[in-house]
């Protein structure tokens, strides 16, 4: 329901009473995102085949509405830190979970055998995945199995302290370092990580820059209201200043996995729309609230590709309220152009989706390709593009943004492409079953 321009979730439990929580702090952006709600094709060979009610038989199950776009595979629950804020509750379970190399391979094979779309991307997590004894071997095997995008979610200690380990990981096929990054002050890390960590983060960036063919870095800030929301713009500037190796930022508003009273919940709760509003304010309008779109906004591109090529393609049919993102073209920290400034996103995606439905019913695919190109010419304004880009080179960048070719394409242009987004993990206070059914990031 809406209250004072905010979207509030209210629940009533016979045993535990009334619960109220802000899920989005801006109803306008919430309603805009709802326009991009799509049900996906699910999984043809789920682990649970006869589930009756979601989420009682979670698995993946036959009721799930999205295939796996990104898999998170925990290599261990051990960690080389003891953070007060820890999504995985690492080192606190009282036992060690650490699958053998063969077990990890079997899990990866299950993901690659998923139908009708094989899982294209994998992120190794934990605990701290880089302390797994056969980490480099796992990266090599993931590459061998055909994962197009291989990531690791890390605190950065191993990559900061052992350059040869970083080099071996990169040479094995590591594409992206998802680097925990809560701010540019050790005062923040003392609260969030119980130790100074800023020097470690700087060292990771420095070491990655030394590599001949470096993986991309994505900064992953956990945002807690009252702790570090004032760091959003400084972190954004840091990413721009280091855009030769930092290719993205993925903010994660804090999820409350333990007990918390109502006052503390309201005090510390931070939503995706808070992020969009704060970034606009802190950058003085350089990145506006209107530049953000939900993850499934790109579904029409996938459905059109599926219709034209005749085979299912990766489709991000997450719930429209799970994540927000925008793409930026960056020349330097002072020259940034959001993609939305030269692409009319909403009408373009609407017409592409309508075209995909027509293409599904047509045996002749060439007219659909020609129509798609005419739509792109209609809604992409070359006069507003970054200098050095035209429609064709821009389309090549988009088509290769998930692969190594994107770096080669961008190297010919003075502008770099950067992803800025946010994904809000659910907790008991904002749990939404409709989000769960459509989740495309599977553990």
Give the positions of each predicted feature.
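Flexible mid-to-C-terminal extensions adjoining Fe-S/redox cofactors in radical SAM and related proteins
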Residues: 1-40, 353-443
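Conserved alpha-helical substructure of the radical SAM core
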Residues: 12-20, 24, 35-164, 168, ...
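Short alpha-helical segments and helix-capping/turn motifs at coil-helix boundaries
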Residues: 56-57, 70, 163-164, 232-235, ...
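Extracellular structured ligand-interaction cores
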Residues: 70, 324, 438
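A short acidic, helix-capping loop that chelates divalent metal ions and anchors anionic groups
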Residues: 94, 185-191, 259-262
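Radical SAM/AdoMet-radical enzyme domain recognition
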Residues: 105-123, 132-253
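Radical SAM enzyme [4Fe-4S]-AdoMet core and its adjacent flexible, acidic
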Residues: 195-199, 211-408, 412
């Amino acid at each position: 329901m809406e209250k004072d321009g905010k979207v509030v979730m209210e629940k009533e439990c016979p045993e535990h009473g009334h619960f109220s929580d802000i899920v989005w702090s801006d109803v306008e952006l919430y309603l805009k995102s709802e326009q991009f709600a799509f049900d996906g094709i699910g999984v043809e060979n789920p682990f649970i085949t006869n589930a009756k009610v979601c989420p009682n038989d979670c698995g993946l199950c036959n009721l799930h509405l999205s295939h796996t776009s990104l898999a998170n595979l925990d290599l261990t629950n051990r960690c080389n830190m003891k953070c007060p804020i820890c999504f995985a509750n690492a080192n606190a379970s009282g036992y060690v979970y650490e699958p053998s190399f063969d077990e990890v391979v079997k899990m990866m094979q299950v993901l690659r055998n998923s139908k009708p779309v094989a899982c294209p991307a994998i992120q190794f997590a934990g605990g701290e995945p880089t302390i797994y004894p056969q980490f480099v071997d796992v990266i090599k095997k993931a590459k061998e199995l055909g994962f197009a995008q291989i990531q690791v979610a890390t605190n950065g200690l191993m990559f900061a302290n052992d350059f040869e380990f970083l080099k071996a990981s990169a040479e094995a096929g590591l594409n992206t370092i998802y680097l925990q990054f809560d701010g540019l002050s050790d005062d923040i890390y003392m609260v969030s990580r119980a130790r100074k960590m800023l020097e470690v983060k700087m060292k990771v960036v420095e070491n990655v820059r030394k590599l001949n063919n470096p993986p991309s870095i994505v900064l992953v800030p956990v945002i807690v209201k009252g702790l570090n929301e004032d760091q959003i713009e400084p972190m954004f500037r840091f990413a721009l200043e280091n855009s030769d190796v930092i290719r993205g930022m993925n903010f994660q508003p804090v999820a409350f996995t333990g007990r918390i009273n109502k006052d503390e919940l309201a005090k510390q709760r931070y939503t995706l729309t808070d992020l969009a509003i704060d970034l606009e304010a802190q950058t003085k309008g350089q990145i506006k609230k209107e530049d953000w779109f939900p993850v499934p906004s790109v579904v029409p591109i996938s459905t059109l590709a599926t219709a034209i090529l005749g085979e299912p393609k990766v489709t991000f049919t997450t719930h429209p309220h799970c994540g927000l993102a925008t793409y930026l073209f960056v020349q330097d920290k002072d020259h940034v152009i959001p993609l939305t400034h030269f692409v009319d996103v909403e009408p373009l995606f609407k017409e592409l989706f309508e075209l995909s439905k027509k293409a599904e019913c047509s045996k002749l695919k060439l007219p659909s390709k020609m129509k798609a190109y005419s739509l792109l010419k209609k809604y992409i304004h070359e006069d507003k593009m970054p200098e050095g880009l035209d429609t064709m080179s821009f389309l090549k960048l988009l088509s290769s943004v998930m692969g190594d070719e994107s770096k080669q394409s961008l190297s010919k242009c003075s502008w770099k492409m950067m992803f800025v987004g946010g994904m809000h993990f659910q907790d008991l206070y904002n749990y939404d079953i409709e989000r769960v059914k459509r989740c495309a990031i599977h553990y």
